């Protein structure tokens, strides 16, 4: 079996406690081509096999050829990757996202070769996302994103 490796990332995901404060500094410190847009979004995901719904504020902006995603959790009816990150007292880089059409092959490869498992899955519109449990190995999660 050929061992698959990721050759790029497309998104950097950051969790913050106060997105309004963060967006002010991001807009002043980084040269975004467009004005930062703050939106609210509700998602339902499967986290460790349990369905959870949560609401968040987020910024999705292109920067330096990558998608820059900044997230503030507003409310939740259970635990998930974002709430656990915040409960652990963390703020900052949460995940690297990879756009792929080979999510199933990558998931199988990482499971077989490295015992890396899926920890959270979800869908938003036509976008499917799968988080791999790499936090203890890499210090952040890997998110596989397919359209």
Language-model regions, residue ranges each:
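Vicinal oxygen chelate
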Residues: 1-3, 9-17, 59-69, 83-102, 107-147
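Long, hydrophobic N-terminal alpha-helical segment
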Residues: 1-47
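Extended intrinsically disordered, low-complexity coil regions enriched in Ser, Thr, Gly, Ala
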Residues: 20-39, 86-90, 100-124
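Short loop/beta submotifs within extracellular cysteine-rich repeat domains
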Residues: 34, 77-79, 137-140
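A cross-kingdom feature marking solvent-exposed beta-strand/loop segments within repeated
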Residues: 38-49, 53, 76-88, 93, ...
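Signature of short aromatic-glycine-proline-rich micro-motifs recurring in repeat-based ectodomains
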Residues: 54-58
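Function-critical acidic carboxylates
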Residues: 73
């Amino acid at each position: 079996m050929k061992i698959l490796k990721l050759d790029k990332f497309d998104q950097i995901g950051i969790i913050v406690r106060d997105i309004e404060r963060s967006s002010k500094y991001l807009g002043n410190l980084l040269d975004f081509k467009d004005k930062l847009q703050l939106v609210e979004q509700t998602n339902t995901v499967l986290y460790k096999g349990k369905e959870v719904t949560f609401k968040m504020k987020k910024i999705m902006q292109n920067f330096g050829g990558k998608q820059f995603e900044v997230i503030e959790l507003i409310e939740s009816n259970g635990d998930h990757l974002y709430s656990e990150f915040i409960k652990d007292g963390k703020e900052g880089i949460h995940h690297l996202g990879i756009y792929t059409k080979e999510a199933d092959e990558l998931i199988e490869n990482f499971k077989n070769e490295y015992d890396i498992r899926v920890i959270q899955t979800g869908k938003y519109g036509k976008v499917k996302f799968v988080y791999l449990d790499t936090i203890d190995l890499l210090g952040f999660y890997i998110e596989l994103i397919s359209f």
